[in-house]
């Protein structure tokens, strides 16, 4: 009471640590535990500081009741709903089996599963929590083969482990554990490209990055003289042109080419975006007085931005690519992109019209298009660099994207300020009101859509009922 008020004490959330549902101590004295009510670190292998030595990257049940660890370090865990999960000594999920059934007495099914144990022959013993009968499971040839491969790898017998994992793959070609095992064996054998193939199938980006680092080093050492020679040749060519091209024929030809590009109105309007990042205030002033830019050029830039955004989402290197285009709803993305853009433009135009802004609807439409070039360049750079960087160099991509996004936001802010002839305070206020208006319009639109769907279902049901009555 000396520190907190009564209201603070009432609202204070009790910091109660999660409790273990069970403990196990193996032959080496290492303590293992299971925790209920969490999907992270539900199975723990404790070090002397109490931390978890396992790296469980797979989804774990939040109702683990018991566990057992055999002499090889393999972890067997029971789930209250009747499932049995088996993990490797390092925490990789090997397999899961079992199910829940309250009204059936079927082998392998449980009403609840409170405990588990394993004998010296590798047989799993369980007890049904409600019905009270024991069930035992004998390891299959496939399971024994997996256990054997893991044991060989832990003993450092990588060639023998590779042979064993290869046999496992013959039985199950999509086994993530087997592909990881083959990849690790290849990694220790120095067969990095083959290791990358298996890590890619297994979705193991950490080890893929490790193998890729070795492949990249080998490529750099082999190609560095060639790359250096090409760069030196280009520098020498540039030097010779500057020295012997006294009449500047090459430079004039380049200028003529650029001039021809700028004589094409649409191309000129698109390339106008390149001037914005360097001098945003001056160039947005030119846009304001209708000297530069066009709705057509802005539309092309929006299209290019959308294409780059989709490539950024789906086209990065394996290490940094977490989405597949098959898992994306393209129609929803296209509609969402168009809706957000349209709402921002309309809301900002309406707000600035009330707040005495000078910008027209077309100019408000053009401002974001000409301001997002740094973000577009950043996305293009990240896409390319994602194929040559490893996990440890991810911070470079983060910095590049952050620079591009911040630069683009500054451009758009200055564009709104310049085109509407606002002060900084007025621009901030107009943006706040724009986003509030944006949210209100979005909520109203969603309500209308939901009500229309309900009305349509109601009318459809009436039509169906009327048709049924007429026919009968």
Labelled PLM ranges:
Residues 212-231:
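Juxtamembrane/start-of-transmembrane alpha-helix segments at the extracytoplasmic/lumenal side
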Residues 258-362:
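Selected alpha-helical membrane-embedding segments in polytopic membrane proteins
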Residues 1-179:
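Eukaryotic scaffold repeat domains enriched in small/polar residues
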Residues 154-155, 188-189, 222:
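Register position in tetratricopeptide repeats
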Residues 174-178, 203-218:
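Boundary/linker segments of alpha-helical solenoid repeat arrays
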Residues 331-335, 344-450, 454:
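Hydrophobic alpha-helical transmembrane segments and adjacent short intramembrane/lumenal linkers
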Residues 187-209, 235-236:
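TPR/TPR-like (Sel1-like) alpha-helical repeat modules
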């Amino acid at each position: 009471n000396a520190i907190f008020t009564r209201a603070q004490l009432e609202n204070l959330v009790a910091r109660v640590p999660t409790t273990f549902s069970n403990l196990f101590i193996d032959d080496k004295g290492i303590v293992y535990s299971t925790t209920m009510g969490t999907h992270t670190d539900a199975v723990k292998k404790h070090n002397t500081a109490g931390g978890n030595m396992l790296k469980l990257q797979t989804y774990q049940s939040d109702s683990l009741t018991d566990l057992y660890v055999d002499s090889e370090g393999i972890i067997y865990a029971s789930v209250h709903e009747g499932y049995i999960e088996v993990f490797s000594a390092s925490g990789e999920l090997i397999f899961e089996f079992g199910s829940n059934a309250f009204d059936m007495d079927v082998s392998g099914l449980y009403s609840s599963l409170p405990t588990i144990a394993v004998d010296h022959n590798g047989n799993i013993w369980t007890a049904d929590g409600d019905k009270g009968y024991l069930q035992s499971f004998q390891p299959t040839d496939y399971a024994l083969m997996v256990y054997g491969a893991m044991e060989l790898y832990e003993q450092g017998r990588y060639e023998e482990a590779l042979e064993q994992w290869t046999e496992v793959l013959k039985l199950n070609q999509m086994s993530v554990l087997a592909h990881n095992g083959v990849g690790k064996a290849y990694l220790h054998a120095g067969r990095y490209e083959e290791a990358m193939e298996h890590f890619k199938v297994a979705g193991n980006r950490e080890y893929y990055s490790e193998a890729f680092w070795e492949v990249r080093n080998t490529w750099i050492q082999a190609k560095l003289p060639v790359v250096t020679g090409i760069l030196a040749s280009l520098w020498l060519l540039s030097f010779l042109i500057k020295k012997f091209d006294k009449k500047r024929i090459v430079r004039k030809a380049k200028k003529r080419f650029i001039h021809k590009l700028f004589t094409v109105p649409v191309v000129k309007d698109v390339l106008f975006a390149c001037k914005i990042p360097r001098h945003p205030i001056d160039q947005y002033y030119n846009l304001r007085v209708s000297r530069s830019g066009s709705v057509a050029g802005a539309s092309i830039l929006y299209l290019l931005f959308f294409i780059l955004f989709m490539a950024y989402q789906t086209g990065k290197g394996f290490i940094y690519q977490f989405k597949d285009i098959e898992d994306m709803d393209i129609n929803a993305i296209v509609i969402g992109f168009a809706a957000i853009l349209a709402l921002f433009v309309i809301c900002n135009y309406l707000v600035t019209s009330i707040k005495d802004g000078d910008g027209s609807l077309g100019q408000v439409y053009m401002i974001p298009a000409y301001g997002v070039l740094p973000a577009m360049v950043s996305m293009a750079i990240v896409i390319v660099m994602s194929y040559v960087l490893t996990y440890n160099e991810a911070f470079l991509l983060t910095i590049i994207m952050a620079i591009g996004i911040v630069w683009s936001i500054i451009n758009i802010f200055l564009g709104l300020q310049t085109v509407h002839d606002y002060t900084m305070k007025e621009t901030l206020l107009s943006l706040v009101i724009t986003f509030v208006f944006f949210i209100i319009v979005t909520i109203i639109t969603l309500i209308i859509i939901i009500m229309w769907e309900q009305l349509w279902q109601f009318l459809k049901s009436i039509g169906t009922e009327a048709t049924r009555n007429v026919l009968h």
